[in-house]
Amino acid sequence: MKAIAYYTSLPINDPNALQDIELPAPVAGPRDLLVEVKAISVNPVDTKVRQNVAPENGAAKVLGWDVAGVVKAVGSEVTLFKAGDKVFYAGSLVRPGGNSELHTVDERIVGHMPKSLGFAEAAALPLTAITAWELLFERLQVREGKQDEGQSLLIVGAAGGVGSILTQLASQLTALKVIGTASRPETQEWAKALGADLVIDHSQPLSEALKNAGQAQVTHVASLTQTDHHLDQLVDALQPQGKLALIDDPKTLDVSKLKRKSLSLHWEFMYTRSMFETTDMIEQHNLLNRVAELIDAGTLKTTVGEHFGVINATNLRRAHALLESGKAKGKIVLEGF
């Protein structure tokens, strides 16, 4: 089968940073689906792994953790899917990625694809949707419906991949007042269009910008970028006994600053369940099915930014370069081999 892989960590402008190769087709394990990959999306995790994780013993390492495709075969213990089903998923970091014609994945972290979307639009969703859902409803323990009326959520980086889904989930499914941050006029408009009640500029001190906008403090913060840079401002912005959740990778984080207000800290990493095969791993199957229903109902919309053409090394190098530049808006998708 065709695949795109790397053998050594190289700068993305090196032609060998990602290469077109041939690999044997994978074989599905008992709980696995064998998926014909139709479309993929590129995420910051792809660039981080490529830059920092050397393949073992000279083997080819395949990236890619957002896939939409069709089930070709199922393992002996599969109960949730059958051959021919259209699926979408984000896979597992401890298994090969999905930048290949065929891919195997545990059924418990796979959802039925939204009926109203094509493969490329669907491939843009899984990783960011799982991250946003788990952060909001599991880490911050926000409740659907009207139960959290009077509470508020500050989303730092509301126009990014996760922020774009999180803004929609919070504004559409909860009673929270949603305040997003974005630094450019076009991304501020994007956050407003996705449902943010208020958008502030995160290139300014956040606690001051909140006060100037008439929002003295918030009960919840979702910090999606530069948490270490913003930490003092986030502590100021949170009410006593508030909740702070983050998804990024700060080099250091002085959590003693949270003590005086008894603030709780919650880390969201969507690969925890698949990495450790937790007993509740199937929750990612359930939430992806729910996301598909919300997409088909028009409650949520996909966040495709750019379509980079067919899935090959040249186009994937272009996608990685754009992500590394920090100038990508919405998700980058590729489709077909």
Segment roles from a protein language model:
Residues 125-204:
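Mid-domain Rossmann-like dinucleotide-binding core that forms the NAD(H)/NADP(H) cofactor-binding site
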Residues 85-86, 102, 152, 243:
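Residue-level marker of beta-strand positions
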Residues 257-307:
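C-terminal substrate-binding/catalytic core of Rossmann-like NAD(P)-dependent dehydrogenases/reductases
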Residues 98-99, 183-190, 252-255:
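Short, glycine/polar-rich helix-capping loops at beta-to-alpha or helix-loop-helix junctions
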Residues 24-41, 51-94:
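Glycine-rich beta-strand-centered segment in the early N-terminal region that forms part
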Residues 144-146, 198-268:
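Glycine-rich cofactor phosphate-binding loops and adjacent beta1-alpha1 units
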Residues 293-306, 317-337:
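C-terminal capping/lid region of NAD(P)-dependent oxidoreductase domains
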Residues 94-107:
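A structural motif shared across PLP-dependent enzymes of the aminotransferase-like
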